[in-house]
């Protein structure tokens, strides 16, 4: 794996919000083990690209906008030269703990608590892999015990620049709005980080999206 110098930041999506910082990584597609895996098995990984930048987003979700109870967990955006990945960070961390522990010859009892804690940090969420050369994304999801995969063209949002600036972690951010798949969103982006990407399926602004939320949040 190539060592890469990455920067640190925190951001905000969805029905709710997202957050980020960074280190080194490669954009990977984790293949989840079946429920009845053997303890000696490691998780198969395919390296698609090497991350040039990565951002951790803290997602906040409510079942309905009026619900006072919200769920929060980390998601990770990895940006490479050809691909980008958007994953549930808790599940990715749990997979890393599993792999490292199995390779080190540990018994399940030796790492179960750490692995379980990482899993508990997150909620089931979709995994996205963007192939920018082909202009498509692959989505992997799981509902209960059923696993789903679909491919679609990378969505292109139509953005409207709006008045108003903000500062997020020292970065000057600008406001933009869009309507995407039946919902209206407000986004903040910074031209100081020159990547036209963001959380989930959002992108296309002249800089990294640092915060996005649905207007009904």
Please provide the spans of the model-predicted regions:
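Bacterial Sec-dependent N-terminal signal peptides
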Residues: 1-33, 37
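Extended soluble regions of mature proteins
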Residues: 29-217
